[in-house]
Amino acid sequence: MPTEQVTLTEEMIGWRLDRALASLITRLSRERLKNLISSGCVSNSQGALVRDPAFKIKSLDCFTVDIPLPRPAHNEPQDIPLEIVFEDEHLLVVNKPAGMVVHPAAGNYDNTLVNALLYHCAGKLSGIGGVARPGIVHRIDKDTSGLLVVAKTDPAHAGLAAQFADHSINRRYRAIVDGHPSLQGHVDAPLARSSVNRQKMAIVSDGRGKRAVTHYRMITPLKNASLIECRLETGRTHQVRVHMSSIGHSLLGDPVYGRSKKAHHALLQSLAFQRQALHAAHLGFIHPISGKQVDFDAEMPQDMQLLFKMLMISNRN
């Protein structure tokens, strides 16, 4: 494994560690160095690992950065069935099933949406996302089902990415949450990686977070639960899950942010429902080539429909 050894300069006192390393190791991006720090690949002159990219430099120390060799992209085309909602020569909209990872990454090098798309599109996907993420403009979590738009050409990718950047994409989710939130409301709270658990996102007030806004409305009150619609003004990682949990209405089945009541726990077990009850139900945007507004809808998958039905039955009893 290649290593880089660097010595800090006096002007870096008070800087964040990731900023200092990025100024010294210019061949690596700051984002890449952030990931290396968080992954335990950076140690100080005493050999102690430093895992916080925001660690403030207090003295002229030396740091060693271990740089893992890149693993070849495992983007082999695979004949995996896809539910294509719309397709033309520029883009396609797919209804992703729960359990499918969007693109290859550590621990998931095949059976991803990208593998399926490479087969379906015969490799004709936008290259802007790089070899690891061809055609991928945005993502949804592995265990979230629903609609994604995929770019087949670079102009389509650029046009879609611009709409995601200016938050003009209309994204609406269906979620089954614990309890009964207000008939409508919104959560405006910045999100960042948790400083305690890097696998989780958290609402933060220390300036690290990116603005995140979720609007929600009640659709159907259920037995100690509710079916709601969430409209995303922004699209941060785990946004709906963290925001709804923060107001006391976590998603049923959510293994990370959930706090299911005993009755819900028993029902989820009986249905073998092992994911967050979240579905990307609506996607609307301006077609990047034609300039026309397009809107797509996808019904909740069978597992969420069954959960909803059982909660409705319980509500009547």
Curated annotation (Swiss-Prot):
Residues of the S4 RNA-binding domain: 15-89
GO cellular component annotations of the record: cytoplasm
Swiss-Prot/TrEMBL keywords: Cytoplasm, Isomerase, RNA-binding, rRNA processing
Catalytically driven reaction(s): uridine(1911/1915/1917) in 23S rRNA = pseudouridine(1911/1915/1917) in 23S rRNA
Function: Responsible for synthesis of pseudouridine from uracil at positions 1911, 1915 and 1917 in 23S ribosomal RNA.
Gene for this chain: rluD
Subcellular location: Cytoplasm
Organism: Zymomonas mobilis subsp. mobilis (strain ATCC 31821 / ZM4 / CP4)
Active site per the UniProt annotation: D141
CDD domains: PseudoU_synth_RluA_like, S4
Any one GO biological process: enzyme-directed rRNA pseudouridine synthesis
Principal location: cytoplasm
The protein, known as: Ribosomal large subunit pseudouridine synthase D
Organism lineage string: Bacteria, Pseudomonadati, Pseudomonadota, Alphaproteobacteria, Sphingomonadales
Keyword Heme listed: no
Gene3D superfamilies named among the record's database cross-references: Pseudouridine synthase (3.30.2350.10), RNA-binding S4 domain (3.10.290.10)
